[in-house]
Amino acid sequence: MREYIQNKWNEKGFKDLTPIQEATKELIQNGEDVVAVSPTGTGKTLAYLLPLLEKIEINHELQAIILVPSQELAQQIGEVIREWKLPELTMLVLAGGANVKRQIENLKKKPELVVGTPGRLTELANQRKLKLHQVQTLVLDEADYLLAQEHLEQTRSFIKKCPSQRQMICFSATKNEILESIHQWINMTPKWVENEKKMAGNENVKHVYIESPVRKKDELLRKFANMKEYQALVFVNSLANAGILAEKLQYHNIPCALLTSQENQIKRKSAIQAFKKGEVPILLTTDVAARGLDIEDLPVVIHYDLPENKEVYTHRSGRTGRMGKDGLVISFVTEKEVRDLKKLIPADATLEAFQVHSSQLQVAQKKKMVEKKPYKPKEKKGTAKKAYPSKDKKSFKTKKSSGKKK
């Protein structure tokens, strides 16, 4: 590694590379096309990022682009890059939802590295504001999603604007037909790297379900939140359901944050920060908005609505138990959905029925399934910060807030 990367590695207390990092490092350094498949939480971002940073020269020419499916993932990867890059290297995040005029102005800084979403990057390239002629490496993070039928044309459209002689790197948590036939959609001859065996830590993710009629699911979530023990990332299947559920929680004075593709970038960033800082116990989200979302030491993921397929279940559940940490995945299901759930969980995982009360979660603790400290809202002076801005201007209150509902 370059000396500055090695120093950062040592500062963070890292020792060995993870299997996916070890398997892809030389391939990426040598300029090979790569398709890498590895479970969530196995260090995929650093697997492509560190060798990429070693290759980039400080010459004010755009040499590498990282394509991602969402604003949140773009910002998240941007934060990681800022931690690891040389101070002289210029990196920009160019994602949809942000001010395009400001992005155009920032491009005058002549970045060597860009992270962005296909739609916004295509827009900037069409305006001739984003110069692609010197691009040597193109990374697709969450490649299975970027190449899914509903996003394929937009992704391909941008790739075609890049030089034909360039390195292609694709990373994904799941392998599907799209990735297997990637050479049909993109001009590349990849080396395949598959790390299907989970890291030991992933085995510490416990999968449980709570049986409930649909009409009582919101009551279950309120019970969980009122225990005031753990934060949870809660997945629903639609924007409408997310908004309705947020309003119900608000009505019962339960603080939460809402992360959907309908919110602008400022509100979405605010929701994530409120959750990360422990200001709210619940972050409600949809699959699109939370794709690749990385929240350190997240103890619990809740499938409020059961996902449609195994890939989505894997991506959702992968938000907890990352990098060898412990986690708990809870699914709210009807009696008929129990059979469907059994088809979604990992083949080597066990599934248990649970009730929502602290004693059962304590059982999970004894088995070292959830190690994060119990959720304790941060004490604020006066009125608590609005976590979910609703139309009637009501605001949530944290546990120890002295303010009253307006």
Residue ranges and their predicted role:
Residues 123, 131-198:
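Post-DEXD/H (motif II) to motif III coupling segment of the RecA-like Helicase ATP-binding lobe
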Residues 203-248:
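Conserved interdomain hinge at the start of the Helicase C-terminal
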Residues 118, 141-143, 304:
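Walker B catalytic acidic pair
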Residues 4, 39, 163-164, 229, ...:
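Arginine-glycine-biased low-complexity disordered regions
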Residues 22-34, 44-59, 80-84:
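Walker A/P-loop NTP-binding motif
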Residues 101-106, 242-250, 254-290:
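Conserved helicase ATPase core of P-loop NTP-dependent helicases/translocases
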Residues 2-7, 61-126, 134-137, 251-259:
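Conserved nucleic-acid-binding Ia/Ib motif block in the N-terminal RecA-like helicase ATPase lobe
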Residues 1-37:
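Conserved pre-motif I regulatory segment
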